[in-house]
A protein has these predicted regions:
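Sensory/regulatory domains in signal-transduction proteins
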Residues: 12, 22-180
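Charged, amphipathic alpha-helical stretches
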Residues: 1-23
Length: 180
């Protein structure tokens, strides 16, 4: 079931799309567009059945090709979509304690993509360098005692590589890896 993790720049707490758009006459068309985007692993533009709205989607994809999400915009056919918020996929190997990033996830997380490697970065580098808040401690417990099915949606206030404060929104899910 697709869930909403953000609306514009505002993080949402994994709201099922049917709940988030419960009164929208375009819900079915949006669900279809999301499904087609995931199946084709490419963004699309489609028109709603009444020809009054355009749905535009973009894939959020990990470097190994796995789809981590879909960004979606709905607007009038003659309206230009706003600039999409930058999003990036990141995968933590809870067994090895390492992270695999995309360039976008490094940028969103406040890292300098020109100086950070995308594979094999120590998980500990992602942790805030100060006293932890409760929600941050939950993520650390996810690493120390990995349990399948744990999902966390949150924001962290961090300092980026330029010394600027930023807020990073994220979703973390703990799922067992299957061997290919």
């Amino acid at each position: 079931v697709p869930v909403v993790v953000a609306h514009g720049a505002h993080t949402k707490d994994l709201i099922p799309i049917g709940t988030f758009l419960r009164r929208s006459p375009h819900l079915m068309a949006i669900q279809t567009a999301i499904g087609e985007t995931v199946r084709s692993a490419t963004g699309l533009s489609s028109i709603t059945p009444k020809n009054d709205r355009v749905i535009r989607t973009e894939v959020v994809q990990m470097s190994d090709g796995r789809i981590h999400g879909v960004q979606m915009w709905l607007g009038a056919p003659d309206e230009a979509p706003p600039e999409r918020p930058l999003v990036g996929s990141l995968m933590w190997d809870l067994t090895a304690g390492t992270a695999t990033d995309t360039v976008e996830s490094l940028q969103v997380g406040g890292w300098d993509p020109a100086k950070q490697m995308t594979h094999g970065r120590a998980f500990a580098e992602d942790l805030p360098r100060r006293e932890l808040k409760r929600n941050e401690a939950e993520v650390i417990s996810m690493v120390i005692n990995p349990e399948a099915g744990v999902t966390i949606c949150d924001t962290w206030d961090v300092i980026d590589y330029r010394g600027e404060p930023i807020t990073v929104g994220f979703v973390a899910r703990s799922v067992p890896e299957t061997q290919d």
